[in-house]
Swiss-Prot record:
Biased composition (Basic and acidic residues): 66-97
UniProt gene name: RH44
Record protein name field: Putative DEAD-box ATP-dependent RNA helicase 44
Domain Helicase ATP-binding: from-to ranges: 241-436
Alphabetized GO MF terms: ATP binding; ATP hydrolysis activity; mRNA binding; RNA helicase activity
KW ATP-binding (keyword) present: yes
Domain called Helicase C-terminal: residue spans: 460-606
Family named by the database record: Belongs to the DEAD box helicase family. DDX23/PRP28 subfamily.
PANTHER family noted in UniProt: ATP-DEPENDENT RNA HELICASE DBP3
GO biological process assignments: mRNA splicing, via spliceosome
Organism: Arabidopsis thaliana
Keyword terms of this UniProt record: ATP-binding, Helicase, Hydrolase, Nucleotide-binding, RNA-binding
Any Pfam family matching the protein: Helicase_C
Cellular component, GO annotation: catalytic step 2 spliceosome
Length: 622
């Protein structure tokens, strides 16, 4: 049966495809097999060469043959026999040569493998570099010093100089007394030295400052240090911020409004500027710097201040806080950013959901650390710090020198008070920190305490607001949300002020609106809870009113710290009732420290004389 043309073409294509697959498919050959194939190729080449030589010889013989004479058969037979014998010996020689060459190549390869293993496991001795001695500073001549012909003066006039004689005056040369000259110059130097010491430090250049000037400078600004190898503080912005630029861990305890944000933002930007730019290759490793704060309002405020500095450098800052869409925040993080400002709870959520990582974050700021501990954020803060890379921590010993090119973790911790819990957190995560104390937290604040009853508080509040006027602003602090709504409702009925509210029960948009309008002085009274007691900077706040006394003195310090910021004065008024006796002792001590007036009722009360938890009469029965 004849095969059709299509069938024939199909069979041919399948065969061609199969042959091509067999040719392209890699086949594993053993070492012995490869050696056998190489030997066979050499033998084939030799046989082919011999075959071509025989054909060439036969052709030449046929050309030279006369054809008329009979061929000498015997002589031709002997010649062919000799040729076969020579060819056999040549073949054997070539085979031995090929075999020896293959064995030599195998031996060289084996020696290379052995040398590589020796170099890997035993190591090699590196050749020592020849030490070149430095040339001597004093050049030595080949001759003796006594042979120098220029050592003595050859001119007779200069060999015997004429001694000058006194001409006039008091027996001095040219009437000039050298001793009097030296005395006058010494007196001039002493006067200049005294004038230099009496000059104020602000009139001197940075390199002219001595230890006395630095001591006076620190006393003028109430700056104190605890630590070693601490650089001098900066006098103005042109001299930068020394501690941050040296990558030292810092614990800052200072008054509110003293520029703490700039103190960690500027060194942070200087640190980021030394790192590679944020691109698609490294933005998946997370931000370069992290700032943790206790409240959403403080996070947004720090974000605004950071953007003011970072926008000129092209750095991006993102805030991560609660009460906002975590998906939108995750989208911002996925686009890459150098700085993240976050509250501990929301940041931990993003870490658990893999929205952000901290693989390359080596700059950490804990702002209002005592407030975060009071709000029970210490476990979340510890979990976040444990996620950060620990391979670049500074050495625990202070004497060890840091490598210049290596990047170490830098940690800033700011607080208005130094509590034991803050010290415990610092000992765990900070290495050889410098404790910097700047100013007094209540230096520019006038504190007033009014003993009253709960029913009389609102009437006293109305009187304070009436005395405030329309051009000044005040913040009223209470302890509960319900009381915020109660006070605002009654103040709106009276209609004597423009009042707004802010507490944790409101949405983030409402809180931002109230705070922004209060800063613009559209409202002059803000009633709030402790959500506004930390970190926020409100300019020209005239008065703080504690409608309810807080439960701790730490909260009291931060509440009244909203006024009297950045060197300006302010007034803090507190309504105190007998139900607040747990803080009587601490409040009395605070007022005495600030030289403020202590109400007689508070001074005479038994609870103000002893620290809470102590029993003064426990030894009275002995």
């Amino acid at each position: 049966m004849k095969q059709s043309f299509e069938g024939f073409m199909k069979t041919a294509m399948e065969k061609k495809t199969l042959d091509f697959d067999n040719l392209t498919k890699p086949v594993f050959l053993t070492k012995a097999h490869r050696k056998e194939l190489a030997l066979k190729r050499c033998q084939d080449e030799i046989a082919d060469r011999d075959r071509r030589s025989i054909v060439q010889i036969s052709r030449s013989n046929s050309d030279n043959d006369d054809g008329n004479r009979p061929r000498d058969v015997k002589r031709e037979r002997h010649r062919s026999h000799d040729h076969d014998r020579n060819r056999e010996s040549d073949r054997e020689f070539r085979e031995r040569e090929v075999k020896a060459r293959v064995e030599k190549l195998e031996m060289v390869k084996r020696e290379k493998e052995i040398n590589a293993m020796k170099e890997q496991y035993l190591g090699t001795t590196k050749p020592k570099k020849r030490v070149i001695m430095k040339p001597s500073k004093n050049f030595r001549f080949d001759w003796e010093n006594t042979e120098d012909t220029l050592s003595g003066e050859m001119n007779v006039l200069y060999q015997n100089p004429h001694e000058a004689q006194p001409l006039f005056g008091r027996g001095c040369r040219a009437g000039i007394d050298r001793r009097e000259q030296k005395k006058l110059m010494t007196g001039k130097h002493e006067r200049e030295k005294r004038e230099e010491e009496d000059k104020h430090w602000s009139e001197k250049k940075l390199e002219e400052m001595n230890e006395r000037d630095w001591r006076i400078f620190k006393e003028d600004f109430n700056i104190s240090y605890r630590g070693s190898k601490i650089p001098h503080p900066m006098r103005n912005w042109e001299e930068t911020i020394p501690l941050g630029l040296e990558q030292r861990d810092v614990i800052g305890i200072s008054a509110t409004g003293s520029g703490k944000t700039a103190a960690f933002v500027l060194p942070m930007l200087a640190y980021i500027s030394r790192l590679p730019p944020m691109r698609e290759e490294n933005q998946t490793e997370g931000p370069y710097a992290l700032v943790m704060v206790p409240t959403r309002e403080l996070a947004h405020q720090i974000e605004e201040e950071t953007v003011k500095f970072s926008r000129y450098l092209g750095f991006k800052a993102v805030s991560i806080t609660g009460w906002e869409s975590i998906e939108k925040q995750a989208l911002k993080l996925s686009q890459g950013c150098e700085i993240v400002i976050a509250t501990p709870g929301r940041l931990l959520d993003c870490l658990e959901r893999r929205y952000v990582v901290l693989n390359q974050c080596n700059y950490l700021v804990l702002d209002e650390a005592d407030r975060m501990i009071d709000m029970d954020f210490e476990p979340q803060v510890s979990e976040v710090l444990d996620v950060m890379p620990c391979s670049n921590l500074k050495p625990e010993k202070e004497d060890e020198e840091l490598e210049e090119k290596k990047i170490y973790r830098t940690t800033y911790m700011f607080s208005a008070t130094m509590l034991l819990s803050v010290e415990r957190l610092a000992r765990k995560f900070l290495r050889n920190p410098v404790v910097v104390t700047i100013g007094e937290t209540t230096k520019f604040i006038t504190q007033q305490v009014i003993m009253t009853k709960e029913s009389d508080k609102f009437s006293r509040l109305k009187k304070l607001i009436d005395d405030l006027g329309d051009d000044k602003t005040a913040i009223v602090f209470v302890n509960t949300r319900n009381k915020v709504d109660y006070i605002v409702k009654n103040l709106e009925k009276v209609g004597r002020c423009r009042v707004t509210t802010l507490h944790a029960g409101k949405s983030q948009e409402q809180r931002d609106y109230s705070l922004e309008e209060f800063k613009k002085k559209r409202f002059n009274v803000l009633v709030t809870t402790d959500v506004l007691g930390r970190g926020l900077d409100i300019l020209d706040l005239a008065q703080v009113i504690n409608y309810d006394m807080p439960n701790t003195m730490d909260l009291y310090t931060h509440r009244i710290g909203r006024t009297g910021r950045a060197g300006k004065t302010g007034v803090a008024t507190t309504f105190l009732t007998l139900e607040d006796k747990d803080v009587f002792y601490g409040l009395k001590q605070k007022l005495n420290e600030c030289n403020s007036l202590v109400p007689p009722e508070l001074a005479r009360h038994e609870a103000s004389k002893f620290k809470p938890g102590t029993f003064p009469d426990r030894f009275s029965h002995f």
